[in-house]
């Protein structure tokens, strides 16, 4: 589907997860993706902000340039075992357009030369090599409002090998320095190498040349061996490299102090939300798995903040786990070890590349970058971050200067008869004695005052803080593989201990720990309090959707009497008369697409399912889901975002940023949150809204501009605020049509998000590049409150 001003460039942007190999160096700083051959539109001149990574990770630069500046790509590809391994894909989009616009004729693409990476055009559906059904035509489609007849065409597509093209190269020029939060930082500007692109005026051919630096062109063979290795083994702890006793037990962030009084803006969005995208360099990791940081948003200008490293490590760990799990499910016979083996293997992969933090370092007190309320799905994550090193034992300890054992952390997850409540006091049962829930039938025995028990006892006199991690039942994930989350509860002091006879008739040790005052409260405690009360404090609307979503979305205001702004709620995109979605060709998978090697929808995603257990595996250029004519059931693994909201969300009044969005339950990393829905506009319509564009979301590139307007008609996505350290990212998804210039904007979780934490994504505004209707530069302060906040929204 296209509109009346389509251009030849539409034939070039045939991106998806595998149809067009694309680098994650084209992923934006908010996690979204920009096709290497066409960017999201932004009319204003763009500057660059660089975020540096470790040497083996390369650097990430926000590719924010003016349309006249061109780009150069570094390409990494793979040598396949045989010709059949190369999957040649093509777009299957049927589009409608008004006569009079230029339409590119389809030329056959003969070959792909890895030396110059010239990209040509290929024939349409014939190159797929899979059996697809023709889409049903809508005979009840309303007539076009245009006086001219509609014409259906099949856009040309691009054929490339299946693997990703890697790397976008840009140069930085230091232009000066500035003071920010008491620090002196360098201000740089992107100087992009030139990249040639030619478009024939007669509309017959469209070819793009990509220059490649020879030293960055890497050909790698894909191994097919057993990547999991022998039977599972218990992961051994690393020997201590250094131990640290902190002088300060609790590190508290300074409160946010707005520098000016805010007016009644509904949400922080003002001017255009732009989903500019930058991809990140991938490095070879193992025979089948490579680590990338998946288009992760930068958390600081230098990329070396402790908080950023924690988030990066967790994102890499979960991406690796999901890939291993997908490979394991594809095996004809499952091997012993199950989920524990997978997380151990993922942990070993990260450690082999130096992506673990403090796991060999013993720390007393606060672990850098870890905040109270952080949630984890696996205990192995605690090991990677150095929060709690043992993969199974409940007590972690070390030797102090005098050679005495002291406790550093405990995990209270229900294995023993611990007293868990909402107070700041924890009664913890010691370890040993076969008291816990064991698979074997060993008889219980008295616990001994040794190792971890002795360390907790010594911590009474030492008065050293002990980290407490609580295990909380998790009901968010679709499967029951993960039974609980692990939540960092903060620092406690051990006050006393005693012996008592347990229910099994043997002696056990009990330890009383008290939470150190001044730390943030765990959000699940607040959720539990609200569930107990009959009426919700501050509730001003029980359902802003008026029943249009599968779950009600309430509005809460505990600050004043203001009500949510009036608007018409729509759960789906609204297309104008000149743009009519035509369903894509379908797959014939009647039992779901999880194990079908010949599924047309999986082929369009590069032969890999983009989701696992209802969560996205990694950030992709474009995700194709099964369409309305596919024969698979609604429960198909390829239908995640099209079924609407599945997480309990609410809007709430913030102190300084209008209305925001949060969840009443834990959100696992990779979970679908919601769509950014509204009315589709042409760019010329959007330009007329200057000064009234708080809810505009730009689509397409600078030559094919489209915009979603959620001002009058929209969904909960219109309330999601900006953050310089976001926990969501925007992912392009297609399912009801295949016009890649008008994708659905779907928000997915970048991290494990605890309850009541505000949801946010990066608007990607440019400082001093936003103007009012008179051409004057507009300035707006940022109140996101993150440690990496730049201080200005634009």
From Swiss-Prot:
E.C. code: 2.1.1.-, 2.1.1.367
Keyword Protein transport: no
Compositional bias of kind Basic and acidic residues: 258-276
Residues covered by the YDG domain: 365-515
Keywords from the UniProt entry: Centromere, Chromatin regulator, Chromosome, Methyltransferase, Nucleus, S-adenosyl-L-methionine, Transferase
The protein's enzyme class: transferase
The SET domain, residue ranges: 647-764
A Pfam short name: SAD_SRA
UniProt record, GO biological process: epigenetic regulation of gene expression; methylation; regulatory ncRNA-mediated heterochromatin formation
GO molecular function ontology, one term from the record: histone H3K9me2 methyltransferase activity
This protein's name: Histone-lysine N-methyltransferase, H3 lysine-9 specific SUVH5
